[in-house]
Regions:
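Pair of pore-lining "gating" transmembrane helices in MFS-fold secondary transporters
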Residues: 2-29, 33, 200-207
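Short hydrophobic/alpha-helical segments at membrane-entry points of transmembrane helices
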Residues: 92-98
């Protein structure tokens, strides 16, 4: 059970972070070649992605209602919008998509981490949470290897987005049955105590 939970969290972060958030980077040369972006607009689109991630992560951190809904929207949204990116043909549309995908990946990252940490702790296997957080790195590596194949086959940016999206869909389909349903992801109903910046904590921050 614990290994299944850790693997499910790992796959979610492969999809939401490694593909949904970071597949954009190896796509930039193809989108520039297709006239969809310039170097300047590519940087702005990437910034929209980071802004979206900040918004999504901040919202997930504060959420006490519809928590599982956010998680599922984050996961399915990352997959759907990666596929939809194949139809985008200009910086404005890509920027909007990247912002929303950023929000989706922020929700997924924070909430899947909360769920896996809680469940693994209950099962006495907290150390397996390290496997969950290997997901983004594995996803980035997978996206990079796919990019090599895509370049070798001289595929278009649109075709590449479809490949990334289909892969994300297949991966999520493999673990969807194990992910939390309504009422299974517990969040405290009250706000946490405010953080007091003690001398020890200050030294930890600066160390």
């Amino acid at each position: 059970m614990a290994l299944r939970i850790a693997l499910s969290g790992f796959v979610v972060l492969v999809v939401a972070m490694g593909i949904g958030r970071f597949a954009f980077t190896p796509q930039v040369p193809l989108m520039i070649a297709a006239g969809q972006l310039t170097l300047t607009s590519a940087g702005l689109v990437a910034a929209m992605n980071y802004l979206g991630y900040l918004v999504g992560a901040w919202d997930a951190m504060r959420a006490h209602r519809f928590v599982e809904t956010r998680l599922w929207l984050g996961i399915t949204g990352a997959v759907a919008l990666t596929l939809l990116s194949a139809a985008a043909d200009n910086a404005v549309v890509h920027g909007l998509l990247r912002f929303v995908i950023g929000c989706m990946s922020g929700w997924s990252m924070v909430l899947i981490a909360a769920w896996t940490n809680e469940r693994l702790g209950q099962l006495g296997k907290p150390g397996l949470s390290a496997a969950v957080f290997a997901g983004p790195g594995a996803g980035i590596a997978l996206s990079g290897l796919l990019a090599v194949y895509i370049q070798a086959k001289s595929l278009s940016a649109g075709a590449a987005w479809q490949i990334y999206g289909v892969l994300a869909l297949v991966l999520i389909a493999l673990v969807a049955r194990y992910l939390p349903r309504s009422g299974q992801l517990h969040r405290p109903g009250s706000a946490p105590e405010p953080l007091v910046l003690t001398a020890d904590l200050t030294r930890l921050v600066w160390s």
